[in-house]
Amino acid sequence: MPLVVQEQGSFQHILRLLNTNIDGRIKIMYALTKIRGVGRRYANLVCKKADVELTKRAGELTQEELERIVTIMQNPTNYKIPAWFLNRQKDQVDGKDYHVLANNLESKLRDDLERLKKIRSHRGIRHFWGLKVRGQHTKTTSRGR
């Protein structure tokens, strides 16, 4: 079934949101999940808060709708998204709740692992040695490292 578009000039086949290329032919809720740190539930909530139709394709959105989506994703607490919905609650550094996206998520995870290694915790040492971290058995598995 081919995709029918009303105005041929306004459709974008590839969008650039938060340093991520997004396919414009996918519905907006699923297209937002291509951004690292955004799942289906968070994408659904952001679209509802931004008053964007979930049936629209990502390439059909106007620039104003895209800006609304990005501002809600970057500042979720300003739009009454609860703290339990965020992916970084009670941060170790300042104790605040954040929703970390895209490149910031990778750097935060790397910083967390470095902190664990620095304080010589059990998890940090296991990461440093390249072993399983969460209590799995290692007698016969994971010998390739």
From Swiss-Prot:
Component of the ribosome, a large ribonucleoprotein complex responsible for the synthesis of proteins in the cell. The small ribosomal subunit (SSU) binds messenger RNAs (mRNAs) and translates the encoded message by selecting cognate aminoacyl-transfer RNA (tRNA) molecules. The large subunit (LSU) contains the ribosomal catalytic site termed the peptidyl transferase center (PTC), which catalyzes the formation of peptide bonds, thereby polymerizing the amino acids delivered by tRNAs into a polypeptide chain. It holds the Pfam family Ribosomal_S13. It comes from Candida albicans (strain SC5314 / ATCC MYA-2876) (Yeast). InterPro entries: Rbsml_uS13_C, Ribosomal_uS13, Ribosomal_uS13-like_H2TH, Ribosomal_uS13_CS. This is Small ribosomal subunit protein uS13. GO terms for biological process: translation. One of its GO terms (molecular function) is RNA binding. Belongs to the universal ribosomal protein uS13 family. GO terms for cellular component: cytosol; small ribosomal subunit. The keyword Cytoplasm applies. The keyword Ribosomal protein applies. Keywords: Cytoplasm, Ribonucleoprotein, Ribosomal protein. It is found in: Cytoplasm.
